[in-house]
């Protein structure tokens, strides 16, 4: 890697200024680059590049829309395989295979990697993204469906809460509360709105419904070149501490989640997730 940097930049006449994404460079790598270009001035360009990535090109949006469509197909395949006695891992494999075949069909000349599914049942749903297991589904289980197609490094997702055969009263009440917050969140996403303002209003709604203390993480985030392996744009998170104003061609999710601890009525994790493309006057739910 360092040899490639030297061959591109040149060592005999090093540039006066070199930009680094400091949030991705380790201390060891920073020291090595500094020793190679000791006369150059280094600047952190991570925030600037992050802001560029937050606004998607039309080509990027097309990839993301195809990803969302393929995520739906993965979810459809998972639902077909949900039945008592089937395991989380086998159901996950079915959804993943459906998505990968569709990615190949849509992008026959691409390179394929990282598409995955998380599918949890029962109390295994209690984390944002718990590992899947060999647990067998039983009637009355709460289920968490999560599909993640990866297309040329572009990440999309579909996440839904389901129940096998029957949802008890407390589980249904919790699910309905989370769905209500999710629907309100979809209405709030539009150009000119601050990320933090969306969160504050949804927090108030959760409090009215009596579930705010069960909320577990942010309400959504940016989409694009990212994954759970290599991060995302921290400046476009739907969190109380992010004051970024939504703009045209930004792409964000709305995904409220509540988690009711084991041993309590309705125990498990509840999450609904949609992706929206910000337009001039509103947002398109893809």
Ranges and model annotations:
Residues 1-286:
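Active-site neighborhoods and metal-handling regions in enzymes and metal-associated proteins
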């Amino acid at each position: 890697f360092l040899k490639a940097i030297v061959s591109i930049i040149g060592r005999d006449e090093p540039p006066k200024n070199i930009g680094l994404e400091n949030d991705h460079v380790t201390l060891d790598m920073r020291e090595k680059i500094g020793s190679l270009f000791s006369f150059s001035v280094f600047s952190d360009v991570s925030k600037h590049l992050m802001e560029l990535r937050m606004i998607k090109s039309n080509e990027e949006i097309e990839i993301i829309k195809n990803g969302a469509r393929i995520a739906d197909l993965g979810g459809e395949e998972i639902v077909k395989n949900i039945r008592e006695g089937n395991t989380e891992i086998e159901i996950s494999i079915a959804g993943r295979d459906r998505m990968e075949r569709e990615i190949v069909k849509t992008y026959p000349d691409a390179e394929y990697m990282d598409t995955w599914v998380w599918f949890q049942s029962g109390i295994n749903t209690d984390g944002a993204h718990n590992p899947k297991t060999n647990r067998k589904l039983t009637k009355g289980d709460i289920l968490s469906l999560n599909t993640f197609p990866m297309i040329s490094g572009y990440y999309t997702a579909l996440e839904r809460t389901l129940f096998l055969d029957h949802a008890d009263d407390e589980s249904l009440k919790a699910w309905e509360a989370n769905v209500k917050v999710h629907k309100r969140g979809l209405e709030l996403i539009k150009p000119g709105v601050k990320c933090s303002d969306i969160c504050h209003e949804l927090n108030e709604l959760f409090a009215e419904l009596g579930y705010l203390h069960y909320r577990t993480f942010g309400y959504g985030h940016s989409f694009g070149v990212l994954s759970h392996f290599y991060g995302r744009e921290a400046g476009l998170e739907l969190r109380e501490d992010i004051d970024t104003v939504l703009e045209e061609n930004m792409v964000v999710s709305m995904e409220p989640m509540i988690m009711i601890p084991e041993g309590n009525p309705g125990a498990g994790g509840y999450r609904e997730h949609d992706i929206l493309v910000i337009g001039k006057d509103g947002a398109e739910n893809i």
